[in-house]
Amino acid sequence: TTKSSSFVMMICVLLIMLIIVPLGLPADRTLAAVTVHPLATKAAEKAFKEGGNAVDAAVASALTLGVVDGFNSGIGGGCFMLIRKSDGEFIAIDGRETAPSKASRDMYLRDGIAKSELSQTGALAIGIPGALAAYNLAINKYGNLDFAKLLRQAAMIADEGFLLDDSYLVRLKKVVNKLRLFPASSRIFLDSNGSPWPKGYRLKQSDLAKSYRNIANHSVDWFYKGPFALKTEQWMVLNDGLIVHEDFISYEAKRREPVRTTYRDHEIIGFPPPSSGGVHLAQILNILENFDLFSMAPDSSEFVHIVTEAMRLAFVDRSYWLGDADFVSVPRGLASKKYARMLAKKINLSKVASINVHSIPEDADSDLF
């Protein structure tokens, strides 16, 4: 089933903040899992009970979220995974979507005018999905459980269905008009009149279950090199899309070095580019470190002003510098303490600064992510 809401499609962002538990630890270990849906949380708990570690639990919950929270998660999109091993090592796995090989700068222009809808709905809005590759890499390198087993467990939920609640329906109603554009999606998420299913309806997704089982039986190659990729190319041809079979074949999730900084006595670990979160969280905190925030009330105008200005400085840099480090130059200096001290001097405590142009960190053309 093809669903599309933006170029990002359905992003599953996984931030693993649990210690990965090695094999052989006592059975009374303390474990925790938190997700946005009870069934996904139960999937994580089940993974723990079967001897899995935090990576296994995260992947189990992510696969389940692909069933019960498809607005935000799913193997049709991408994800970032930040993992801390029990020995203290941090690993960042980049499973973000990539653009098709045929993508071009002007692909969303028509008669020289940008058409935003083309980047939000339809064949041109879709990137090469990376979540599945990231899950597979994480499980194979850092997990204890069999990926196929986790896929089959999530497939059971897709087959048996789950009850729609108010939260799901609020989001479903927002995309009804877009779902109606795609018959395969309409058949699943809308009734015969093209209206959303009511609260309490048991939503079953047999196609998704079948896909999960095919991946379990034939590995991720079924998705990236076999029938799924070929079927996607066929759909793209019929719907003026750009993705071809070779785009799936060439996709791979990547291990990257996390962004590390400190804020006063705390170490902060963030995700590197193509995510902007880690870089600019570090930048904002580094700027704020130059001010005595502890002497201010959190709701005071002074506190709010300083934090706002720090964020403005970071976001103007983000607009200019940030991108996929495989294709553009992203300076490491954005997250440096020295650069933050320079930016902090631009903050006027008595008025809003004019921040219209990005700043330039030291060695911006050579010290890169």
Protein language model annotation of sequence segments:
Residues G277-V279, Q283, L313:
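Extended, domain-scale alpha-helical bundle/helix-rich regions
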Residues L25-K42, K46, A54-K225, A229-P272, ...:
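Noncatalytic scaffold domains of N-terminal-nucleophile
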Residues G226, I284, S366:
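Extreme N-terminus nucleophile/cap motif
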Residues F291-F369:
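Internal maturation/activation junctions in enzymes
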Residues L285-F291:
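Active-site proximal helix-loop segment of RNase H-like, two-metal nucleases, encompassing DDE(D)
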Residues T1-S5:
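N-terminal secretory signal peptides that target proteins for export/translocation
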Residues M10-P22:
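Bacterial N-terminal signal peptides
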